[in-house]
Amino acid sequence: MSPLAQKKVAHLKRKTRVRKKIRGTTERPRLNVFKSAQHIYAQIIDDTTGTTLVSASTVQKEASESLNHCGNVEAAKRVGALIAKRALEKNIATVVFDRNGFLYHGRIKALADSARENGLTF
């Protein structure tokens, strides 16, 4: 198996292992994070109804203006602050953090820390 295929398999294993344990409820929805090479996305999801309550990403102009590159730690911090602001507007204060199989390092950690600093608790 090629190194890239091994990396994808390892990511999928981490993702399914974490997802089996984490479930978002109406009282405490799930903060899901996805990162690509160019962008980072965050959603707050209620798994009981299967709906996305709040979302933010670097694709949106509000988070990406005055950034040269949207796939870095600074962009992740902005998305974290934006998701926290939008969640608090909808009276969502506590969430369950779902790193989606990504290692808790770099952009994922920056987004989580920024969301905590701006009022979300998890």
Swiss-Prot record:
Keywords: Ribonucleoprotein, Ribosomal protein, RNA-binding, rRNA-binding
Pfam family, any one: Ribosomal_L18p
Coiled coil (UniProt feature): none
Gene Ontology cellular-component terms listed: cytosolic large ribosomal subunit
Family: Belongs to the universal ribosomal protein uL18 family.
Task of the protein: This is one of the proteins that bind and probably mediate the attachment of the 5S RNA into the large ribosomal subunit, where it forms part of the central protuberance.
Protein name: Large ribosomal subunit protein uL18
UniProt organism field: Geobacter sulfurreducens (strain ATCC 51573 / DSM 12127 / PCA)
